[in-house]
C-alpha cells in the first residue's frame, strides 16, 4: 500500500465507500494509459553486468502487497483499479519461470495490511495508520480478507513458501522471517514484484541493496498508485538502486545458457 505523495497519508476521499467510484473515475482521468509508461533502458552501470549469469545465482522471489485490497472491487484500495494494469499476468509469468529454475530457493508472499490497529507503532505510525482507514467500515472478517493474497497468485503458492505481513512502516526486512530465510538459504539475488512500486518495492529494493543482496525489479509486475508517477519511480530505482526489467526479459535471461 502507499500514501499520497502530497500528504504522506492515503486520501480519505479515495477510501470512502460512498465516494470510491468518483475517486476512481478522477484517478483514471488524470493518468495516461499504462502502455504509455515504458520500462526505461538499463542504466549504464547495469549494462556492465551479465544479468543472465546473475540470475543463475541462489535467488529468492518476493511478491509484496499483491492482495485483495488492491485487486478486488470491494478492497480498501479499489479506487486504484490495479486489476486493470497488467501486474498479475506479469507476476504469474515470473513465478512460473522461477519455479522451473533450480537456483530459485525461496518464494515469499508478503502482505501489507492497511488495518494496523494491533501493529507496533510510534506516535507517527499511529496517526499515519489511522489516516489510511478513515471512513472505511470493515468488520474483522473483511479486514482479514482485504489483506489476503489475491486468488490468481494463491493458486501458485506451494508448500515451503513463506507467507507473512510487513509489520514495519515500509520494509520486509524488519520483524519478519525474511532475513533468516535468506541467510539460511545463502540467497544472493532477490527478484521483486508487487505494489506499490514507489513505496514497498522501492523501499525493499533499497533495503536489499544496503544488506548486500542483488535486487532486480520486474517493472511490469509492479505499479504506482497513480500511473503518472510510474515513469519517475522506474527512473529513480533504475538509476540508483537496481536494474528494472520486464517479465519477458526475466524469462529470456533466466533461459539463457540453460
Model-derived features: where do they sit?
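Short, conserved acidic/polar surface loops in the N-terminal third of protein domains
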Residues: 73-74, 118-125, 150, 175
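Von Willebrand factor
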Residues: 90-118
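Short glycine-enriched, charge-decorated loop/helix-capping segments at active-site entrances
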Residues: 75-84
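Conserved protein kinase catalytic core
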Residues: 71, 117, 226
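Short acidic, Gly/Ser-rich segments with clustered Asp/Glu that frequently serve as metal-coordination loops
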Residues: 67-73
Amino acid at each position: 500500500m502507499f500514501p499520497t505523495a502530497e500528504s504522506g497519508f492515503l486520501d480519505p476521499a479515495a477510501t470512502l465507500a460512498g465516494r470510491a467510484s468518483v475517486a476512481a473515475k478522477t484517478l483514471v482521468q488524470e493518468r495516461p494509459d499504462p502502455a504509455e509508461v515504458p520500462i526505461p533502458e538499463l542504466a549504464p552501470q547495469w549494462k556492465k553486468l551479465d544479468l543472465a549469469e546473475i540470475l543463475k545465482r541462489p535467488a529468492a522471489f518476493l511478491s509484496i502487497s499483491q492482495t485483495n485490497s488492491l485487486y478486488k472491487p470491494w478492497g480498501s484500495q479499489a479506487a486504484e483499479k490495479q486489476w486493470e494494469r497488467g501486474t498479475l499476468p506479469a507476476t504469474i509469468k515470473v513465478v512460473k519461470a522461477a519455479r522451473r529454475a533450480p537456483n530459485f530457493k525461496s518464494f515469499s508472499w508478503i502482505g501489507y495490511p492497511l488495518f494496523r490497529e494491533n501493529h507496533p507503532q510510534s506516535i507517527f505510525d499511529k496517526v499515519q495508520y489511522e489516516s489510511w482507514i478513515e471512513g472505511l467500515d470493515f468488520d474483522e472478517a473483511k479486514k482479514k480478507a482485504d489483506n489476503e493474497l489475491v486468488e490468481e497468485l494463491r493458486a501458485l503458492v506451494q508448500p515451503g513458501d513463506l507467507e507473512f505481513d510487513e509489520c514495519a512502516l515500509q520494509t520486509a526486512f524488519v520483524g519478519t522471517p525474511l532475513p533468516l530465510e535468506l541467510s539460511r538459504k545463502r540467497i544472493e539475488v532477490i527478484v521483486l514484484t508487487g505494489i506499490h512500486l514507489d513505496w514497498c518495492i522501492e523501499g525493499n529494493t533499497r533495503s536489499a541493496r544496503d544488506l548486500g543482496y542483488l535486487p532486480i525489479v520486474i517493472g511490469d509486475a509492479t505499479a504506482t498508485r497513480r500511473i503518472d508517477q510510474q515513469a519517475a519511480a522506474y527512473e529513480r530505482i533504475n538509476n540508483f538502486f537496481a536494474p528494472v526489467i520486464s517479465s519477458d526479459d526475466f524469462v529470456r535471461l533466466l533461459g539463457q545458457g540453460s
